[in-house]
Amino acid sequence: MSKDYQSLAKLSPFELKDELIKIASSDGNRLMLNAGRGNPNFLATTPRRAFFRLGLFAAAESELSYSYMTTVGVGGLAKIDGIEGRFERYIAENRDQEGVRFLGKSLSYVRDQLGLDPAAFLHEMVDGILGCNYPVPPRMLNISEKIVRQYIIREMGADAIPSESVNLFAVEGGTAAMAYIFESLKLNGLLKAGDKVAIGMPVFTPYIEIPELAQYALEEVAINADPSLNWQYPDSELDKLKDPAIKIFFCVNPSNPPSVKMDQRSLERVRNIVAEHRPDLMILTDDVYGTFADDFQSLFAICPENTLLVYSFSKYFGATGWRLGVVAAHQQNVFDLALDKLQESEKVALDHRYRSLLPDVRSLKFIDRLVADSRAVALNHTAGLSTPQQVQMALFSLFALMDEADEYKHTLKQLIRRRETTLYRELGMPPLRDENAVDYYTLIDLQDVTAKLYGEAFSEWAVKQSSTGDMLFRIADETGIVLLPGRGFGSNRPSGRASLANLNEYEYAAIGRALRKMADELYAEYSGQAQNL
């Protein structure tokens, strides 16, 4: 087993997972339990019902044009004149349908709470769900941006930021956001080969792997969370950000895999570092798990002018296949200031790159360069997330905004926390409780678990017997359970990451029992060796 693991040690945890699955699935008489991936097995149904019902209304709106050809399935573009009245009739005639009731409430919320033009909203939704026009503006549809922006500001704890000061770029999930941002930072000279980038560790593996690619060749500086501090960043680690050689700080908040939000002390520490030492520091925060946290506040809320926020709808709404996300930027930000401070020769080169977009290239904001770069600049006029995707994103946002009691959120939190309690109960340990814990994942610290079960001496022996990777292969081989190695996420502790989102409660009970059984067998082996000494 050791030889097998060593040959695969350089793989990303997500690629290593496939090898672990092969081993865990090798026994046809045993259930394979894959706790390695974060794809949730829950999803929001109401905004999806609304999406499909809206599609039926939109198709009928299309057929108001070219009605003489509807027998062969030809429709035209939706018309805004009278659309509100026709929609209200549709609602009245189909009020018994859950998705339709939600659409009716959405229209009321958009009109009465957000103060948006109801006809313009309906026309954008109908036109968007039909997918019959290019996304205009390419960055994001106008009304969809206003709706999603309200959701982002609320969920990221950024209520102090005026909504109109935030720009959004709708993207194909967090994956696309990361790829676009790294590439535009390089293309615009904001990150160059050899530059130092700080990375909050442990972290989602691509944040470690992307800077190491030859096309970026960045020098990584680890900002290490401390497991003894419940995975918070010590002040001494955050103080590394004072180094003027560090250009940007990448972090996932709440973290992945520890699944802990940054506490108020850490947020204030970063705020003070930026204010007193590093007003030029660029920050990129990926806050996809923020909606699972209690009283969450993003670095974007703390340092809005220094921070690019990446948010994906994938986990909270069970929408990994939809590929929905946004990049948020404050209108006054250090990314634009850094562009202004480039050498004249670099500015001239960028003038040439973006010359087809507008006469005054130097007024082009970084977020708009992201849009252009995402389509090789020349195709900027056809850039943008598909309009049906933007409609679903807007409906997800309205679903959360109208749920003022946060019933959906509380239900999901209870679900994943019950799963964690069940896993650790069967393992024979109390669940890991912390006010900053999010519990979407749990990082099972193999050294800590073995020490608590059978003492420090056994724990030291068990860790010496095999590497973490070997142990995870053994777990897969003997129990059929797939965990991802914590070390692959930048953790310095021997650990395995288990997602608490993608299996059912009884399956987490089985995982806990299987891990406990394996620990008992290891202890019996250890005890036998001790007696023979």
From Swiss-Prot:
The PTM N6-(pyridoxal phosphate)lysine maps to: K315
Alphabetical list of Pfam families matching this protein: Aminotran_1_2 (PF00155)
Alphabetically sorted, this entry's keywords are:
Amino-acid biosynthesis, Aminotransferase, Decarboxylase, Lyase, Pyridoxal phosphate, Transferase
UniProt-listed Enzyme Commission number(s): 2.6.1.1, 4.1.1.12
**Dependence of activity on temperature:** Optimum temperature is 45 degrees Celsius.
Q: Which residues are recorded as binding L-aspartate?
A: G115, N256, R497
Tell me about pH and activity: Optimum pH is 5.
Answer yes or no on keyword Amino-acid biosynthesis: yes
Q: What does this protein do?
A: Bifunctional enzyme that has both L-aspartate decarboxylase and transaminase activity.
Q: What is the designated name of this protein? A: Bifunctional aspartate aminotransferase and L-aspartate beta-decarboxylase
Species this protein is from:
Comamonas testosteroni (Pseudomonas testosteroni)
Q: What is the lineage of its organism?
A: Bacteria, Pseudomonadati, Pseudomonadota, Betaproteobacteria, Burkholderiales
